[in-house]
Amino acid sequence: MSKKPAGKNSNRIVAAVCLAFFTGMIGMAYAAVPLYKMFCQATGYGGTTQRVEKQYAGRVLDREITVRFDANIAGVPWEFQPVQRSMTMKIGETVQAHYQATNKFDRPVTGRATFNVQPELAGPYFNKVECFCFTDTSLKPGETVDMPVLFYVDPDIVNVPELKDVKTITLSYTMFPVEKNKPVASSEPVQGTSKIISDTEANLGG
C-alpha cells in the first residue's frame, strides 16, 4: 500500500490555515466600520456626541460655555449652514439651535449628516436630545428646511482635568448625499435601506 508524501499533507494544511486567516481578515475589515461607529457613539471617542433620552441634565451650573456651530457639505448639492454662529449657555442648560438646508438641484435629494465636536474629549459630555442628524432628510428641488438640534452640556465636564478650563466647544456637521431605493420628495424623515453615494452620482442626480 502506497503512502502519500507527508510534505503534501503539510502543504495542504498550511494552505487551509492561510485561506481561513485571510477570509477572517476580510470579514473583520467589513465589520470594522460599523463596530468603530458603535464604539464612538458609546464612548464619545473621536469627538462623537452622545444621544440621550432625558431632556434635562438634572442640574445647571453657575458657569457659562459657548458652543460654536459649523456646517460642511460632501457631494450633496445643497446649501447647508447654521442659523446662528454661536450660543452661550449655562453648563447643564438645555438649549435649541438651528441649521438650514436648501436643495439647489433640479431633483429631490436625500441627505444624511455626520457630526462631531471639538475638543474631542468633550464628545461624551455633549448630549443631544433631538437632532436632524438622527434621521435622513429629503428635500424637493428648491426646498428649504429648518433643522433643529436640542442639546445640553453635561455638568460632569467640569470634573475632567483636561476640560475643566474649556470655555468653547465647536459642534460640526457634514452633510452627505444618500440614495434611496425609492425616490422620496419630502422633507419628512424617511425609512428604508440606503447607501452613501459618490460625488459623481450626486451631481447626476443619483
UniProtKB/Swiss-Prot annotation:
Membrane topology: Single-pass type II membrane protein
Keyword field: Cell inner membrane, Cell membrane, Copper, Membrane, Signal-anchor, Transmembrane, Transmembrane helix
One of the record's GO cellular component terms: plasma membrane
Transmembrane segments: 13-35
Compartment(s): Cell inner membrane
PANTHER family, per the entry: CYTOCHROME C OXIDASE ASSEMBLY PROTEIN COX11, MITOCHONDRIAL-RELATED, CYTOCHROME C OXIDASE ASSEMBLY PROTEIN COX11-RELATED
Chain's role: Exerts its effect at some terminal stage of cytochrome c oxidase synthesis, probably by being involved in the insertion of the copper B into subunit I.
Protein name as it appears in the record: Cytochrome c oxidase assembly protein CtaG
